[in-house]
């Protein structure tokens, strides 16, 4: 996964957290004792989980030490783990959870065909695997990033599949399977705010791909110019 900057990501905390709130609200389980938040970032999603299930024992997991540090500082009462999601899913641990939750993280993790069944094994019978992945890779702002980057730019791959892929993968092992798509429209004040939004998410892998600060500055300048 790309490395993340918690301060940059949280510049738009309310907007970034809304899909997480909606996902948590769709999980109909009431008696939830244990939850793990995969790809918890700076803990904004973990806070939503705590509000949804206030009596639960909550664990946040992320492979970014800086994100976990920020999450632990903001919410020291929960358990925090620095670990890669694939490694966690492949670990033969017997620890299971009432809810395995992941908001806007698994699109950075490869091999969903093997990953999702492994994650599902960590859910207790009668529990829930609740996951949200963005599906806006073909939005104009995202397409523009790829147009500006040279073909030689090595950018971390985005992993997302059509809805029927996930249905076929999970239906036989699920008592109930809900799949839906929501489009979130964020009204931002100006072009600069749009660029700041994407610097905390979609632009991050592109900016990491450049070797020099000069290249990053040039890329951002061209992106800002063309997104107007």
Language model segments and positions:
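C-terminal helical/coil "lid" or tail adjacent to the Rossmann-like core of SAM-dependent
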Residues: 4-5, 173, 177-228
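Conserved alpha-helix/loop element of class I SAM-dependent methyltransferases that forms part
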Residues: 15-33, 48
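A short acidic, Gly/Pro-enriched loop at the edge of an enzyme's catalytic core
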Residues: 90-100
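A short SAM/SAH-binding and catalytic strip from SAM-dependent methyltransferases
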Residues: 99-112, 135
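Helix-to-beta-strand junctions that scaffold the AdoMet/dcAdoMet cofactor pocket
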Residues: 109-110, 123-125
């Amino acid at each position: 996964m790309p490395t993340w900057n918690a301060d940059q990501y949280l510049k738009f905390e309310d907007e970034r957290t809304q899909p997480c709130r909606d996902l948590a609200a769709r999980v109909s389980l009431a008696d939830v004792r244990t939850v793990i938040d995969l790809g918890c970032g700076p803990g904004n999603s973990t806070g939503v989980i705590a509000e949804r299930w206030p009596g639960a024992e909550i664990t946040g997991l992320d492979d970014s030490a800086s994100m976990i540090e920020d999450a632990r500082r903001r919410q020291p009462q929960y358990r925090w783990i620095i670990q890669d999601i694939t490694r966690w899913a492949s670990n033969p641990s017997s620890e299971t959870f009432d809810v395995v939750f992941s908001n806007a993280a698994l699109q950075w993790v490869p091999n969903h065909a093997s990953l999702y069944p492994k994650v599902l094994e960590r859910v207790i019978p009668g529990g829930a695997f609740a996951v949200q992945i963005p599906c806006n890779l073909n939005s104009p702002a995202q397409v523009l990033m790829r147009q500006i980057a040279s073909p030689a730019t090595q950018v971390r791959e985005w992993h997302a599949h059509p809805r029927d892929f996930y249905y076929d993968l999970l239906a036989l092992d699920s008592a109930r399977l809900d799949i839906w798509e929501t489009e979130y429209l964020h009204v931002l004040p100006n072009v600069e705010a749009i660029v700041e939004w994407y610097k905390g998410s979609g632009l991050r892998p592109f900016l990491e791909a450049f070797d020099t600060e000069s290249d990053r500055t040039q890329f951002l300048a061209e992106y800002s110019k063309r997104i107007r």
